[in-house]
């Protein structure tokens, strides 16, 4: 199986692309969904509360506010959660070893140094104006967190430069689907 990582800036279209690939029958993995599932574990919640005593209770919103405003807390949580995420990613790859492709959406792929787990990386991108427009429509949108995320992430340009492939999601649906189809064709040549 070729393992393909999908990354990009906040609200760049990563989840849309992953959902599209899932709909087309490809094997997919979403880091954000995986972490949300991990957070359902009461034992893990207790461990995080011990790790981050600033939190009075396990609350995703409070965790977000803390980690985007406290570098040490973010580093502690990442050092705790990333190995668990890597285990789940490795399991996904093993379970789908007979598939031609496996696509994994990892928002902080480069920042977390996860590129070593992939044969190829795709960066999905669009303009800042489009990202902001998409972000505002989310029920969880918080302008301060949006700006903090932008601060800690590599720039979109850096992600594009590091990637094997880049997809512009700031286009109409037909053009986006054509770009994804071209990506699949390019990957087919590398199997």
Curated annotation (Swiss-Prot):
Compartment(s) of residence:
Cytoplasm
The UniProt record gives the binding positions of ATP as 11-16
* UniProt entry keywords in alphabetical sequence: ATP-binding, Coenzyme A biosynthesis, Cytoplasm, Kinase, Nucleotide-binding, Transferase
Domain DPCK as annotated: residue spans: 3-191
Q: In which pathway does it act?
A: Cofactor biosynthesis; coenzyme A biosynthesis; CoA from (R)-pantothenate: step 5/5
Q: Which InterPro entries match?
A: Depp_CoAkinase, P-loop_NTPase
Enumerate the Pfam families for this protein: CoaE
What does the record list as GO biological process?
coenzyme A biosynthetic process
Gene Ontology MF terms = ATP binding; dephospho-CoA kinase activity
For this record, the Gene Ontology CC terms, alphabetical, are: cytoplasm
* EC number, as in UniProt: 2.7.1.24
Instruction: Please tell me which top-level EC class this enzyme sits in.
Output: transferase
Q: Which reaction does it catalyse?
A: 3'-dephospho-CoA + ATP = ADP + CoA + H(+)
Chief subcellular site? cytoplasm
Q: Name the job this protein performs.
A: Catalyzes the phosphorylation of the 3'-hydroxyl group of dephosphocoenzyme A to form coenzyme A.
Q: Which HAMAP family match?
A: Dephospho_CoA_kinase
Q: Which family does it belong to?
A: Belongs to the CoaE family.
Which protein are we looking at?
A: Dephospho-CoA kinase
What is the name of the gene encoding this protein?
A: coaE
